Amino acid sequence: MLVPIFTLKLNHKINPRMVAIGKYDGIHPCLTAATQAGKVFIHNPHTRAQRPTAHRLSQSTQDSDISLLNINQSVSCLTAGTLGPKSTGDTLLVGSQTNLLAYDVHDNTDVFYKEVTDGANAIVLGKLGDIQSPLAIIGGNCALQGFDYEGNDLFWTVTGDNVRSLVLCDFTADGKNELLVGSEDFDIRVFKEDELVTEMAENETVTSLCHMHGSRFGYALANGTVGVYDRTARYWRIKSKNHAMSIHAFDLNADGVVELITGWSNGKIDARSDRTGEVIFKDNFSSSVAGVVEGDYRMDGQIQLICTSVEGEVRGYLPASKEMKGNLMDSSIEQDLIRELSQRKQNLMLELRNYEENAKALPGLSEGESKMGVIPANTQLQTALSVRRASESQKAHIELNISTPNETIIRAVLIFAEGIFEGESHVVHPSAQNLSGCVRVPIIPPKDIPVDLHIKAFVGGKTSTQFHVFEITRQLPRFSMYDLNVDPSAPEPTGKVTFCINDRPQRVVMWLNQNFLLPEGIDSPDVTFSALRGGGLLRISLQTSGEITLRTDDIDLAGDLVQSLASFLAIEDLQAESDFPVYFKELRATLTEVDEFHSVHQKLTAAMADHSNYIRNMLVQAEDARLMGDWRNMKKRYIELYDLNRDLVNEYKIRSNNHNALLARLKSVNQAIQRAGRLRVGKPKSQVITACRDAIKNNNINALFKIMRAGTTSS
């Protein structure tokens, strides 16, 4: 059994997912974590001499080994690592919703302090692609930004939604790091510098990512799912009723391969095999886990796995010795495994007994057939998918029709599908009087992604008490919520995107048949669909010159179609021209609002500064009156002071609301740049994103819309 080699009780609470280890003097590892009241604590048990107090750094009154770094803002992320080329020790990086601080703990100095308008929800430090110097990369409000050791902004791009997790990993095995980004739109995106390489769709917000080895990485979702990918292939995943607070890769059983270490919200720590997800080690804290890191904390040349809880408990574990032979569990956990295996054996014995009873019933079919669930040998489970428009009683949906070709009935159906049903599964259990050989299940995909439907059906006779289980998998195409039956009165879409391909029309037809739910194979690439989810039309047309025009008012749909078609036809670089009048009009209004909110923000900041000066003067006058015994004037000044203070609080509320509204508008602007990029592929996409950002920086709104339409700055 593996036990902690050290346990510490720190007198400071720890914010979840904000734990790091840094060698700030280049030698001694120090546990660093965000704590309450906008502070970061640095635990350094190695140099116990009194440490100097600086403008940000102060000694903790509760623990002599802890120094407190005052950020004066709510900390949203932190990390530590080598940033400067000449620095001997690690740099501490602390992100908030408005700023990024790079701090040299050893010299008590700011390396740089940058304002970040999009906030910093996640941070990672390291080398990216061909960029020579290490970057502090932050993910915020739909944007990614990378700073070097001087605070220069060397990297910027946009992503689909608010960023929640980041990790650097050699995803393409070319010897250079790619950036993996987990966001609130449930996607894991892979960036080769500012170029999007690929994306994997999950079914919840991606809260944590960690590099394991090679192109393999672990991930955690907000719904309690953890798992492992190797590139775009998912090896395994498990789901828990608790939330994964932190994941980390560490070789705990000393077999040369790292395991996925997960810290959970109920205080549990577990280590799972990267190949199978099998649990090889468990331990428990009395409170939620805050973070999992690694370091040579005892300075004895051995790396320990260090786990922390939100209450400030710290435990260190050494990898298992050879004598343990990989047996890291305690005896009680082994007993749990024996109980689980016994239960599984009992279930299998029961299933075997059912088969034996069915076999005994075969000679006398007339008597036992109905009860024992014996069915004809030619019984098959048939499935069909069809598009159903909205009616008075039901929303528009995809109808899954499950049927048998003979007199047998379907007693129950279980469907497992990611991201469609709550809890990822759906059970249909018709009442006894409604039993038949056909079950219809309405399916409403929330967005345009391909979904595998894993179907299990219980099939038997009308009076059976035992049933045969049929299993079948059916894929729902990506663009299944689009119907060929079009309302003639529907208005023509005003938005469009146009691009050229060098491929046969038959290949486009193949793509249509593979990605849309069509009643029968079509042989023309010129089609019109009705969008069931958002309304409106989608027209796809192909000229003999190879020019494709997609007409829709939904810019997101246009981007999805361009990316899907380019992937199917293996197009690496694709330039496109687009025009979405309705969306561009909304964006222009949003940009005007951004300017207005910026102006209001500056006025409110100036007003608050004036009020602060008034309060300072009023306080001095009130204290003078008190010392002179002038109670009448003192009372008058304190009443005025109370009124000023109340005004200041009200102004702060207005400023806070203004700031939140500004953030929402900035998110819309970043998403607009992302959408304009998704209408192109490869280098043209990167060029559009960069050019759009430059246009916004220079406040050149007309150039911004020209770039979004034409895809180039020269047009």
From Swiss-Prot:
Signal peptide, first to last residue: none
InterPro entries in the record: Bardet-Biedl_syndrome_2_prot, BBS2_CtH_dom, BBS2_GAE_dom, BBS2_hp_dom, BBS2_Mid, BBS2_N, BBS2_pf_dom, WD40/YVTN_repeat-like_dom_sf
Gene Ontology CC terms, in alphabetical order: BBSome; centriolar satellite; ciliary basal body; ciliary membrane; cytoplasm; membrane; motile cilium; neuron projection
GO biological process, alphabetically ordered: cilium assembly; determination of left/right symmetry; gastrulation; intracellular transport; Kupffer's vesicle development; melanosome transport; non-motile cilium assembly; photoreceptor cell maintenance
Localization of this protein: Cell projection, Cilium membrane; Cytoplasm; Cytoplasm, Cytoskeleton, Microtubule organizing center, Centrosome, Centriolar satellite
Pfam families referenced in this protein's UniProt entry, alphabetically: BBS2_CtH, BBS2_GAE, BBS2_hp, BBS2_Mid, BBS2_N, BBS2_pf
SUPFAM superfamilies: WD40 repeat-like
UniProt keyword terms in alphabetical order: Cell membrane, Cell projection, Cilium, Cytoplasm, Cytoskeleton, Membrane
Keyword Cytoplasm: yes
The protein's assembly and partners: Part of BBSome complex.
Function recorded in the entry: The BBSome complex is thought to function as a coat complex required for sorting of specific membrane proteins to the primary cilia.
Protein's name in the database: BBSome complex member BBS2
Species per Swiss-Prot/TrEMBL record: Danio rerio (Zebrafish)
Lineage of producing organism: Eukaryota, Metazoa, Chordata, Craniata, Vertebrata
